[in-house]
Amino acid sequence: MNEEKRRQLWKIIVEAGDYLQGQLPDHPNHPKGRNSYAHVAICIKSKFNQSYKDIDDSKFNEVVKYIEYLKKNPS
């Protein structure tokens, strides 16, 4: 992904992490609470099989839609 889109996407990831703060369900492996920013990044990596930085520019809108889905469906 080019630098401009990568920065835009990181800003969207941070905003999603802010939004999800305190909304993720409790998990026994995270007694102090879950990291919502890491959650978004890990979900992106899991779905697209690569870091958000390495995803092709052509999938930018698809990644943004997926982040919106994550915000609506905290898990």
Say what each PLM segment does.
Residues 1-75:
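Positively charged, phosphate-engaging catalytic surfaces used for nucleic-acid and nucleotide handling
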